[in-house]
Structure formats: C-alpha cells, structure tokens
Amino acid sequence: MADRSDHLVAIVDDDDAVLDSLRFLLEVAGARVATYHSASDYLADAEVRPDCLILDQHMPDMTGLELVERLRADGVQLRVMLITGLNSPPLRGQAAALGVTKVLEKPPTEQELLEFIAGPG
C-alpha cells in the first residue's frame, strides 16, 4: 500500500458514525485525518491545510456545495469528494461547476476513498 502519511484529509459531516468510520478507514491506510461536525467548524479552524476534503452534502448550517463555493471564492483550490444520500444529475452538475473532484453516494467504499486521497494534487 502506498505511503499516505503525508496526506491530510479533512472530513466534514454532521453524522458521528460517518465521521468515525471514514476516519478509521483512512487512518488504517496511513492518512492523517481531521474531522469536523459542520462547515462552520471547518471554516473556524484557520490552521487546517488539507490536501483533500471529504464533505457531506446535507448538513444543518451549510451544505457541502455551499462550503465549496465559499472556499473557491476565497481562492482555495483542493480536491473535494462530496458524499450524499441523494446523488442526482442536478447536484452532480452543480458540483462539477464548482470543481468538485468526485460525487459519490453514501457510503463511499474503501477503494473509492483510497483512490481519492491518492489522486493527483
């Protein structure tokens, strides 16, 4: 397995079970992981500089796409995986327009996660 210890992956999801399972899978693969329960929590952590971001689409304070839109407006360019229970063509179109790397239905597979964090960038 490739060395992923230099990758910092930020995960933003309001569901503790999802955060815990994604963190576990990525840490076992050797990635460093930072987790956040909301988009606001992520934005408040000025120190974080992840290599990639895994976002839930449906969160109480801000959707995943709203967070991506804000990051792009601030000039932040990083790879983003959007995970959702409702993967519709309009959502995929909006995500593509914002430069989201991947849109996947929950739960993403271990292979999908590992390929994403190992990707370019």
Regions found by a protein language model. Give the residues of each.
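Non-catalytic signal-transmission and effector/linker regions of two-component phosphorelay proteins
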Residues: 1-10, 16-17, 23, 43-44, ...
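Acidic, metal-coordinating helix/loop segments flanking the phosphotransfer/catalytic sites
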Residues: 35-52
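Acidic catalytic/metal-coordinating carboxylates
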Residues: 37-38, 63-66
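Receiver (REC) domain active-site loop signature in two-component systems and cognate sites
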Residues: 59
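Short amphipathic alpha-helix used as the core "switch/output" element in two-component signaling
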Residues: 65-77
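Alpha4 helix (beta4-alpha4-beta5 surface) of REC/receiver domains from two-component response regulators
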Residues: 66, 87-102, 115
